[in-house]
Amino acid sequence: MKKIFKFILASFPRPILIKLSFIAQPLLVYFLKGNTYIDPIDGKGFRRFLPYGYGRQRENVLSPSTLSLERHRLLWLYLKSQTDFFIKPKKLLHFAPEQAFYKRFKKIEHFEYVTTDLNSPIATVKADICNLPFESNSFDSILCNHVLEHILDDTKAIQELYRVMKPGGMGVFQIPQDLKRDITFEDHTITDPKERAKLFGQYDHVRVYGTDYFKKLESC
């Protein structure tokens, strides 16, 4: 199973993977249903989760029903239990919308929900994160998860996120991070997918963030 999923992840770009998931998801839910693992996003149980990972495959991490990973489920639980995110009416901007959240956010009547990405087939606005087509101070909340590590000019991208967020707004800007690394490592001369995967962890990543990521967010 791990070899199959690793091959699929390595062979198809993300927009195609999203389209393929529409076909595979109902079958996976049916054949893997059980009660060993519970997905807190939809409450469904499975005898096991699926493996996932572009390099080293992790066992039992991808939920068959929501296609959520650990970070998605943790974020869901945090937003539900520690914030008023789901309670207050808001205009929400969601970059590269995760399938785990997309349908659920879209159904919330007191959300004005806007999705954006350059390539995602489920994004409503095709836009460059470094040059967003939105007015300043437009959004109450912004979700931008595991996007910035793909962007060459992440400083400009973060500045754009701040520009379109309302004063006092909430932003969740998750990135993959090496907590043992003090300084972010990036080298824009590295363009070979295999070399990027080796150095940055994934073929389409352009850096590995260190603990200085938080200072970068503060300085932009």
Describe the predicted segments one by one.
Residues 3, 15-18, 24-37, 41, ...:
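S-adenosyl-L-methionine-dependent methyltransferase catalytic module, highlighting the catalytic core
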Residues 118, 144, 176-178:
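An acidic- and aromatic-residue-enriched active-site/binding cleft used to recognize and process polar
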Residues 128-130, 147, 205:
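Residues marking the start of alpha-helices
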Residues 95, 134, 139-143:
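Hydrophobic beta-strand segment of the Class I
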Residues 2-133:
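Conserved N-terminal segment of class I S-adenosyl-L-methionine
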Residues 140-152:
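A short SAM/SAH-binding and catalytic strip from SAM-dependent methyltransferases
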